[in-house]
Amino acid sequence: MTKTMMIFAAAMTVMALLLVPTIEAQTECVSKLVPCFNDLNTTTTPVKECCDSIKEAVEKELTCLCTIYTSPGLLAQFNVTTEKALGLSRRCNVTTDLSACTAKGAPSPKASLPPPAPAGNTKKDAGAGNKLAGYGVTTVILSLISSIFF
């Protein structure tokens, strides 16, 4: 496994961990899509493992895909656009689009997220919460990076 793929896998795992309500399902879904990373910037048919992963995710884990497609900045962190991700699906002959995320019966990724915390009385209160969350994310990222290299 190349260094880039390992970093991508670690970053995707961190992203999945940040989606706390459905952590186990999200982590599994995202990790299954790692074989698609090398095919994102090509115009050829992706490898069979990638296409099989996409087909399975559309059939069994639509909530996860919807979360990935509709979370602002999630794909952008890897220089991937929603159009590129959907184009990869089309090259695998998987016909789905964002309307599947809002179709009747398809779970809404936003519905599973916890409600926002009540606003603090001062800006200082909000800043403290953001700092605490930042330390947690930083710790997770550093732990994953160190486990890859050591």
UniProtKB/Swiss-Prot annotation:
Going by the UniProt record, its keywords in alphabetical order are: Cell membrane, Disulfide bond, Glycoprotein, GPI-anchor, Lipoprotein, Membrane, Signal
Q: What does UniProt give as the signal peptide span? A: 1-25
Q: Where is this region: Disordered?
A: 103-125
Q: Which residues form a coiled coil?
A: none
Entry annotated with the keyword Cell membrane: yes
What disulfide bonds does the UniProt entry report for this chain?
29-66, 36-50, 51-92, 64-101
Lipid linkage positions (GPI-anchor amidated aspartate): 125
Write down what this protein is called: Non-specific lipid transfer protein GPI-anchored 7
What would be one Gene Ontology cellular-component term for the protein? plasma membrane
Residues with glycosylation annotation:
41, 79, 93
- In which tissues has expression of this protein been reported? Up-regulated in the epidermis of stems.
Q: Which organism is it from?
A: Arabidopsis thaliana
Q: Could you tell me what this protein does?
A: Probable lipid transfer protein.
Localisation: Cell membrane
Q: Could you tell me which Pfam families the record lists for this protein?
A: LTP_2 (PF14368)
The family database entries (SUPFAM superfamilies) matched by this protein are listed as: Bifunctional inhibitor/lipid-transfer protein/seed storage 2S albumin (SSF47699)
Q: Does the keyword Ion transport apply?
A: no
Q: Which CDD domains match?
A: AAI_LTSS
- Matches recorded under InterPro entries: Bifun_inhib/LTP/seed_sf, Bifunc_inhib/LTP/seed_store, LTSS
Q: Which family does it belong to?
A: Belongs to the plant LTP family.
**Membrane topology according to the record:** Lipid-anchor; GPI-anchor
Which residues of the precursor form the propeptide?
Answer: 126-150
